[in-house]
Amino acid sequence: MNQMNLKRSILITFLALSVFGCATLPRDPKETLRQIHARPMRVGLVEHPPWVVRTNGEPAGVEVDLIRNFASELGTTPDWHWGGEQEQLEALQHYQLDVVIGGLTDRTPWSKYVGFTSPYFKETYHVALPPGSQLQNIKGTEVSVEKGDPVAAEVESKGARVVRVDDSSNVNGPVAAADWKLEQMSFTVTNEELDSLQHVIAVPPGENALVKRLDEFLYTKRFEMKGLLQQQVAKR
């Protein structure tokens, strides 16, 4: 074989291997997606209403319903496991769980250790007013925020005084909350944007086939998310 033919042979072999490699992607090193077809899906739950809600019976919440439907599409059922965020993500890192849900966002520091879906819902926060009210600037103004909502820090950074409440829907004054909730309350949203969060679901590291399948499922639900959140809050 002369030098020209040798180079051509090497090039053909390289291209063949490249095509074969692309054809087999995405892959799951631990074959999580294949395993889920043959057993229950192990789902880690982190309590975070309205995404994940603990009840006396079966868990509830928007992401709980999403994963329940996703499992059904795969021909399996979810096996629920409650725990704290760190505990659940550590278990996921070591492939002891298949999915973790709990209102996680792409700001999580765990992206170095586990996998995540693409952001499937953008949650934007604004200050809003009851119908007929006007406000030029929230500086020095009392703004109600539901207890436990981290957007309170953003409100304070704008110079407003935070009033923590159990249920913002009962407030008759300025409120800081997610846009989907403000719409449900029929409040008038101001131009005072406070924050914007991209929601994701956690999966084991490197399980690309599972991520791809879950991404495809979540994409089909993108226009339903606002309504699902509003329905969940209305159940309270």
PLM segments and residue spans:
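Sec-dependent bacterial lipoprotein signal peptides
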Residues: 1-22
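Extracytoplasmic small-molecule ligand-binding "clamshell" domains
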Residues: 22-104, 109, 151, 162-163
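Extended ligand-binding regions for polar small-molecule ligands
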Residues: 23-25, 61-73, 132-156, 195-236
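Hydrophobic/proline-rich hinge and linker segments of small-molecule sensing/allosteric domains
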Residues: 40-47, 114-135, 201-204
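Short, well-ordered beta-strand segments
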Residues: 42-46, 142-144, 175
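Hydrophobic residues within well-ordered alpha-helices
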Residues: 70, 92-93, 168-171, 214
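A ligand-binding cleft/hinge motif common to bilobed small-molecule-binding domains
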Residues: 102-113, 168-196
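Short, polar loop motifs at secondary-structure junctions
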Residues: 103-105, 130-133, 146-152, 178-182
